[in-house]
Amino acid sequence: DKNGRFIMNEAWAKLNFGKNFFAQLGRQTLSYDDERILGGLDWNIAGRYHDALKLGYADPNNQLHLILAFNQNDETKIGGTYYVQAGAQPYKNMQTLWYHYKSDYTPFDASLLFMNLGLETGDAATKESHTRYLQTMGTYITYKDNGWNVDGAFYYQMGKNLNAEKVSAFMASLQAAYAIDKTWTVVASADYLSGDSGDSDKYKAFNVLYGTHHKFYGAMDYFYASDFKNGYAPGLFDKRLGVRFCASDKVDMDLNYHHFSTAAKLPNLKKALGSEVDYQINWSVMKDVKLSAGYSFMRGTETMDVVKGGNHKSWQDWGWV
């Protein structure tokens, strides 16, 4: 409602045209691949949703989606066309094309994504507004065979940001997990998101857009679930080693170690941000009932204090059930 006490999370209609084509219109979740760029984040009350038209084609080996979205809210500034990034409508328009291929003959799957995002900025006093267009394009690939589960992604961004700066940014990720047996699995991963050091004519910090950020970069949500401080946009290099132990069909646990550093070299600061350890245990009590608990702690550096705030000398931890 107008007082912000009630919000519709999801409401859409879907029409199927024959066996392979469909159209879906309304407020809906957009979740693709490993959710780096578009994810179904649902940690807060409202969740993440998009008012969009999704046109699609699907057969046993191919999926193709075209997503078209436009936002207009009369209660925002300049007659509903100036969007505050902290609000519920961070873009004015969006066009996304996604293609996924699943092979019957090899253990590889692959996806391609292209997104054109119209971000609006302006001056409420002069009632002038401008739409800046940011393009994101990339691929996501998976391989599953003989105990190996490997996935990787690469995305590149170009266009302009809200400040009308030319953008040239990228992110790359690689994760490899190997099941030693039915009980033990080891995993290693690396995520690199380019950052901006302020010494280039192009803005080089990658925008993570609408992904499920809690899924990556450590369970304590220091990075990308919240903004960097003091105008910094240093990017991130996250290296992870982990192990999973399945005690039984109903109980499993994960232990992961992360080492974080900035991607860009910042003046008078070292790159190292700190280390984090995450532990989680899961118990399947019965069908549709699962109990999880976890504990995490972070040991930061002076650089962490500058770009994220806080005091690295104090103990930082988090436990939950």
PLM regions: where:
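Outer membrane beta-barrel
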Residues: 1-75, 96, 100-104, 109, ...
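Membrane-embedded beta-strand positions in outer-membrane beta-barrel channels/transporters
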Residues: 10-12, 52-54, 95-98, 136-140, ...
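Surface-exposed extracellular loop regions of Gram-negative outer-membrane beta-barrel proteins
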Residues: 21-27, 132-173, 283-284, 289-296
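Transmembrane beta-strand segments that form the barrel wall of outer-membrane beta-barrel proteins
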Residues: 25-29, 36, 40, 64-71, ...
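Outer-membrane beta-barrel translocator domains and adjoining extracellular loop/strand segments
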Residues: 35-42, 75-86, 121-134, 162-171, ...
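Internal metal/ion-chelating core segments
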Residues: 57, 61-152
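Extracellular/periplasmic loop regions
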Residues: 127, 149-153, 157, 162-246, ...
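Outer-membrane beta-barrel "beta-signal"
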Residues: 314-321
